[in-house]
C-alpha cells in the first residue's frame, strides 16, 4: 500500500511553527516511504476563514519547500460530497435527525454539571421515528453504545477510549453545513490517507472519527499525535515568545533550511546528529522516533543553525534569499558587486540575512557621514599620512584585485613602520563609514576602484578639516 499523508490547516490565521512542524513530519513520512503528500485546506469555519490566511499558508509551505502531490483541496468545495454521505448514513440508520432545541441542550448541560456528570448529549432523538416537519434539526452520528475504541499511536503507543464517554456527534448543523470532524473523515477516506500526523490536541477527536470510518466501512489510517511546542519559559508557544509565523522567520532573516532543520529536531532525533539536510531527514525519519514529551523552542539554537547554513550553503543560493532582504531594505543591488560575492565575504559574521543585508549597504550606496564614534577614534590627525600614502599605492595599481590591494595596504604599513591597524582602521572607516567589515582587501575589491578612491579622498578631507579646525 502506498503511504499517503496530508497536512490540513484551517485558514483562520498564518502558518505558525507548530503547524509547520506537523506539515514537515507529515511530508517526511510520505517522502521517506516513497509516498504521496496531500495539502487540504479545512475551511468549514466560514466566518473565521479568510483568503489572506489561505494565501499565507500556501506562501509558507512554498517558502519551506514542502511541495505537495495533490491539492490544495478546499472543504467548502466538497459540501455536495459530504451531504451525499450524510444522506446515505440517514438512510442506513448510522445517523439521525435531532430536533432538540438549544434551550433543551443548555438545560441538559446545566443539570449534568450540577450533578457532577460528564456533559454530553443524552440520545433523546436517537431512536425516534422519522418526522414530517419543518422544525430545525441537526444531524447526529449514532455512536456505538458499549465497547471501546483502541488505536496504536506512533508517538503515544496504545490509546483506548470507552464509547460510553462519547456522545452522538453532530455531523451537520441546522443550516446544513457539515461539521469539521465529519468532513475530516470523508476527506481522509476519499483521498486515501493512510497515515494522519497531527497535533496532540486532536487526540480526543480520533475515537469519534474512527467510529464514523467504521460506520462507513472505510479503512482506518494510522495515527501520530505530536506534542505541543513550548516557549523557553515552559508555557505554550505564543506571540509573546516572539515570532511564531513561518513567514515572520523569513522576514527576520532565517533560511528555510535552518528553520526546517530546527523544527525537525523539536521532538525527533537521530543519534546525536544536530545538522540535517532535507535529504538526510528523508533518509532517517521515522514516526516512531518522535518523542511524546513537549519540546521547548530555543531561539539561540535556531540562530546557530542559521549561521551554519549561511556559511555552508552555495553562496549563489543564499543570494537568492538575500535579494528579498535587499529589496525589503531598499538597497539597489544593480549598482555594486554580485550578491553571491557579498555572501561569501560577509557569511562568517552574519547571524541572519536581514543583518547581512543591512551590513552590506556600503557596497552599493555611498554614505553621507562617517560613524561619529568611529571617526572620532580613527579619523584623527595621525591618520592623515597613512590614508594619503595608501591612496597613492592604490592609485598606482595596474589591476584591481584582492591580492594587489592587500599588497598595497601592507606596503603602506611597512614604509611608515607602523602596525597594520594604524593603516587598516582609518582605511576601513574611510571606505565603509563604520568600524566593521570583512578583510579590507576583499572589502575594497567589492566596493570597486572608483568608489573606494572617492571615499578615501573624502576621509582625507575630513581629517584635514579636523586638523585645521
Swiss-Prot record:
InterPro entries registered for this protein in UniProt: aa-tRNA-synth_I_cd-bd (IPR045462), aa-tRNA-synth_I_codon-bd_sub2 (IPR020751), aa-tRNA-synth_I_CS (IPR001412), aa_tRNA-synth_I_cd-bd_sf (IPR008925), Glu-tRNA-ligase_bac/mito (IPR004527), Glu/Gln-tRNA-synth (IPR000924), Glu/Gln-tRNA-synth_Ib_cat-dom (IPR020058), GluQ/Sye (IPR049940)
Binding residue positions for Zn(2+): 98, 100, 125, 127
Aminoacyl-tRNA synthetase as UniProt keyword: yes
Entry's Gene Ontology BP terms: glutamyl-tRNA aminoacylation
Pfam families recorded: Anticodon_2, tRNA-synt_1c
Class of this enzyme: ligase
Record EC number: 6.1.1.17
Family: Belongs to the class-I aminoacyl-tRNA synthetase family. Glutamate--tRNA ligase type 1 subfamily.
Function: Catalyzes the attachment of glutamate to tRNA(Glu) in a two-step reaction: glutamate is first activated by ATP to form Glu-AMP and then transferred to the acceptor end of tRNA(Glu).
Protein name: Glutamate--tRNA ligase
Amino acid at each position: 500500500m502506498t503511504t499517503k499523508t496530508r497536512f490540513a490547516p484551517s485558514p483562520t490565521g498564518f502558518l505558525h511553527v507548530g503547524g509547520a512542524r506537523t506539515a514537515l513530519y507529515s511530508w517526511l513520512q510520505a517522502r521517506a516511504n516513497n509516498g504521496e503528500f496531500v495539502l487540504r485546506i479545512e475551511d468549514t469555519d466560514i466566518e473565521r476563514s479568510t483568503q489572506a490566511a489561505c494565501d499565507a499558508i500556501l506562501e509558507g509551505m512554498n517558502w519551506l519547500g514542502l511541495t505537495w502531490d495533490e491539492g490544495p483541496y478546499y472543504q467548502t468545495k466538497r459540501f455536495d460530497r459530504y451531504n451525499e454521505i450524510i444522506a446515505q448514513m440517514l438512510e442506513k440508520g448510522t445517523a439521525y435527525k435531532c430536533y432538540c432545541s438549544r434551550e433543551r441542550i443548555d438545560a441538559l448541560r446545566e443539570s449534568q454539571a450540577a450533578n457532577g456528570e460528564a456533559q454530553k448529549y443524552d440520545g433523546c432523538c436517537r431512536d425516534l421515528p422519522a418526522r414530517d416537519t419543518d422544525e430545525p434539526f441537526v444531524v447526529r452520528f449514532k455512536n456505538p453504545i458499549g465497547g471501546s475504541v483502541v488505536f496504536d499511536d506512533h508517538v503515544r503507543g496504545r490509546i483506548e477510549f470507552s464509547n460510553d464517554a462519547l456522545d452522538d456527534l453532530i455531523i451537520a448543523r441546522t443550516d446544513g453545513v457539515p461539521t469539521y470532524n465529519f468532513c475530516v473523515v470523508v476527506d481522509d477516506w476519499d483521498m486515501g490517507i493512510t497515515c494522519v500526523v497531527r497535533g496532540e490536541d486532536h487526540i480526543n477527536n480520533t475515537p469519534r472519527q474512527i467510529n464514523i470510518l467504521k460506520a462507513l466501512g472505510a479503512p482506518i489510517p494510522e495515527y501520530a499525535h505530536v506534542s505541543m511546542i513550548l516557549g523557553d519559559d515552559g508555557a505554550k508557544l505564543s506571540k509573546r515568545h516572539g515570532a511564531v509565523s513561518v513567514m515572520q522567520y523569513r522576514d527576520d532573516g532565517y533560511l528555510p533550511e535552518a528553520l526546517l532543520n530546527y523544527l525537525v529536531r523539536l521532538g525527533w532525533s537521530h543519534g546525536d546528529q544536530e545538522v540535517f539536510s532535507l535529504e538526510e531527514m528523508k533518509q532517517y525519519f521515522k514516526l516512531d522516533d518522535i518523542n511524546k514529551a513537549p519540546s521547548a523552542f530555543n531561539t539561540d539554537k535556531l540562530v546557530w543553525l542559521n549561521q551554519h547554513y549561511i556559511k555552508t550553503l552555495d553562496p549563489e543560493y543564499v543570494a537568492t534569499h538575500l535579494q528579498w532582504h535587499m529589496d525589503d531594505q531598499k538597497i539597489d543591488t544593480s549598482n555594486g558587486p554580485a550578491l553571491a560575492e557579498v555572501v561569501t565575504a560577509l557569511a562568517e559574521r552574519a547571524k541572519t540575512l536581514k543583518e547581512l543585508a543591512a551590513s552590506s549597504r556600503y557596497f552599493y550606496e555611498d554614505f553621507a557621514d562617517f560613524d561619529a564614534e568611529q571617526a572620532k577614534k580613527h579619523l584623527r590627525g595621525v591618520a592623515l599620512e597613512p590614508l594619503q600614502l595608501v591612496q597613492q599605492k592604490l592609485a598606482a595599481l595596474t589591476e584591481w584585485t584582492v591580492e594587489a590591494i592587500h599588497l598595497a595596504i601592507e606596503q603602506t604599513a611597512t614604509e611608515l613602520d607602523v602596525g597594520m591597524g594604524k593603516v587598516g582602521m582609518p582605511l576601513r572607516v574611510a571606505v565603509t563609514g563604520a568600524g566593521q567589515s570583512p578583510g579590507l582587501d576583499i572589502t575594497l575589491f567589492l566596493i570597486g576602484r572608483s568608489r573606494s578612491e572617492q571615499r578615501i579622498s573624502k576621509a582625507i578631507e575630513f581629517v584635514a578639516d579636523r586638523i585645521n579646525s
